[in-house]
Amino acid sequence: MKTYFQKPQEVQRKWYIIDARDKIVGKVAEKVACLLRGKHKEVFSPHVDTGDHVIVINASKAIFSGKKETQKLYSAYSGYIGGQKTFSPVQIRQKRPNFIIEHAVRGMIPHNRLGRKIYTKLHVYEGSDHPHAAQKPIPVTLD
């Protein structure tokens, strides 16, 4: 019996929606990465983008476990001498509340061309409003 690999043109994509309100960032990101990658499907192939679109709402209300809210640091480097900056989650939430979820998910998907393509199917919104109601997203609960 031969192993079946799904072809890119055969993939049927669905839309899922996850509410991140009062949910732990890592657990939300893990579920989102699984859905984006397509690992929940029986036809998963590691070299084919078999994943679905994922909408994350209330991203600004996601929480960290433990003391990460005060101790975790995000860093950015401009490329110049002395150009490294560090930001706490509190500072990030004020400027870009979606970044925390996006950064966590980006770290959980492959770091190659396929991963960049997978990442385009992630839609993160600060509040509960989103423009994807026409796609009839399926609500996902975190277990």
From Swiss-Prot:
Origin superkingdom: Bacteria
GO biological process, alphabetically ordered: negative regulation of translation; translation
Keyword list, A-Z: Ribonucleoprotein, Ribosomal protein
Pfam families assigned: Ribosomal_L13 (PF00572)
Key word Ribosomal protein present: yes
Residue runs in coiled coils: none
An annotated Gene Ontology molecular function: structural constituent of ribosome
A GO CC term assigned to this protein in UniProt: cytosolic large ribosomal subunit
Xref: PROSITE patterns: RIBOSOMAL_L13
InterPro entries tied to this protein: Ribosomal_uL13, Ribosomal_uL13_bac-type, Ribosomal_uL13_CS, Ribosomal_uL13_sf
PANTHER family documented for this protein: LARGE RIBOSOMAL SUBUNIT PROTEIN UL13M, RIBOSOMAL PROTEIN L13
Job description of the protein: This protein is one of the early assembly proteins of the 50S ribosomal subunit, although it is not seen to bind rRNA by itself. It is important during the early stages of 50S assembly.
Family to which this protein belongs: Belongs to the universal ribosomal protein uL13 family.
Quaternary structure annotation from Swiss-Prot or TrEMBL: Part of the 50S ribosomal subunit.
Entry protein name: Large ribosomal subunit protein uL13
